[in-house]
Amino acid sequence: MSQAAERWDLSYTQNRELSWLAFDQRVLEEAADPSVPLMERLRFLSIFTSNLDEFFMVRVGSLTDLALVAPNARENKGGFSPAEQLRRIYAAVVPLVQQRDQVYRELIEALAEHGVADIPYKELKNGEREYVRAWYREAMRPLLMPQIIDPSHPFPHLKNKTLYAAALLREGDKRRLGIVGVPDVVPPILPLPARPGAFVRTEDILAHHLRKIFKIYQIEEQAVVSVTRNADISYDEAMDQEDLDLRAQMTKLLRQRERLAPVRLEMQGEAPALQAMLLRRLRLTAEQSYVCTCPLVLKYAYQLDSLDSALFYPPHAPAYPAWLDREVPMWEQIRQRDVLLFYPYPSMQPFLDLLRQSAADPAVVSIQMTIYRVAGKSAVIKHLCAAAENGKAVTVLVELRARFDEGNNITWARELEEAGCRVIYGPAGYKCHGKICLITRKEKTGLSYVTQIGTGNYNEKTAALYTDFSLLTADRTIAADGVAFFQNMLIGDLRGSYGKLLVAPVSLKQTLLRLIDGEIARGDRGRIILKTNAVTERELIDKLAEASQAGVRVDLIVRGICCLVPGVPGKTDHITVTSIVGEFLEHSRIYCFGEGALRQMYLSSADIMTRNQERR
């Protein structure tokens, strides 16, 4: 028996990685659902694929590292070692890839009936073929850098998630590998002007021209391939270098990420000898390779938007709340009553109006805010810069370690500083994941405040796609908490105490445990409802199981990973778990304890995850 099994009760928990794969399978099921509009199904297939890409980069990458440094470590939900987890992951992905192939075939057949056609190069009509050839000669061929692999031409670095056309070449009795990348600057698809909705994928065009590119060789096998690399970089060293520029250190780390080891090889098309050669060069095993018929990248689904509206969900435009008056300053309306926005049904515009108005308001003296992820063209950043340029004291805590947004946040930090904002970063060892904005106004009667706290990012794009709550309040206790929070962040103090806000790592998990204990004391009159993106934190899982065993009714609404298994007799009989996957991404976190007059409810930016509860 493993140490994890001896220490933890594994009868009502499951491994987080396998639970995550079950979540991504639910996304795949949306792509297979005939009740979902066809183009939305194709987009769900793209989301499934990009989700899986990130899973391999981060989770499989992390486990690969862990298998080297702590091979005997056992995780506490399934009792598996790193190597056992990797074996189970690689095996579990095989049927998912096969199901994706099947769903893609069905979708392409159904979409073709509506004129949306992924046309193989070999099926192009004569006029279309000439059009594609001309495009290839003018737009793609000059950018190509083909290479053969031999003693004079070493195996190149294959960039993460870049598409390559690879070929097994023969010259006399010698075999060589030939490879050429799809240039980053070319579009993923080439529309066919004579057939609206029809297109050729760029990698298919490149693959067709391999015989001309490697014209002095005989091509024995060929395929479109992609390598997924470990992207799990460690920030600890950068954060520990007190005398160094953190932005420069993060930039250096991002460059290192591009060179990390491969963890997966994908191939579109059967080419066993070519596959074996690539695996040997990449130092991967056969179980780390997947052969499919579906395209390896499906993001082109988001470029096909000028089609029959029946192929999409009905258009949804977030509305300006009817209970707010656009002619009255937001500050005055919030002072009269709290404003709770539930994106994407009401829009983010009232909050943006508050920022814009505050930037120009002579009475506003300061704006303090956290930034984790913002939009590519961010109105939030624009208004913060305008406020600083208008003489306001603007402090922005930018989290440089927001995964895959590190580069963007480095750029935003620089832009904010150049506008006159004071920029600080999250403390060493902890990401700042909280979403809070504090605006201070000087009036005749003294200082007044508006505080915004929310479950999601300050991102106009995702606010139209994700469900999130945003509370705008003039509550003075919450404002005092906001003042204390930013003062503590400025001096690096994580131990601060707060009146209404729960702040990890000091009071969040501890309070949740206490609140669950309160419901346990009420027995079968107790009630707990938790809506979150993930449930992985072992101590909280055990406490919820204890609540179930005391008769407390527990409803968990969990979009993604849920390591707690409901309905286990004598352990979790009174717990239900519901996962919602649909048109909008469920992102809000709501924690509710008790019923009626005893009910306590919290909005949160934190999931029931160890990293959220203890390392943020």
What annotation goes with each model-predicted range?
Residues R553-I557:
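Hydrophobic alpha/beta core scaffold segments
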Residues R538:
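Active-site glycine- and acidic-residue-rich loops that bind
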Residues M1-I528, E546-A550, C562-R616:
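N-terminal localization/anchoring segments of enzymes in phospholipid and broader phosphate metabolism
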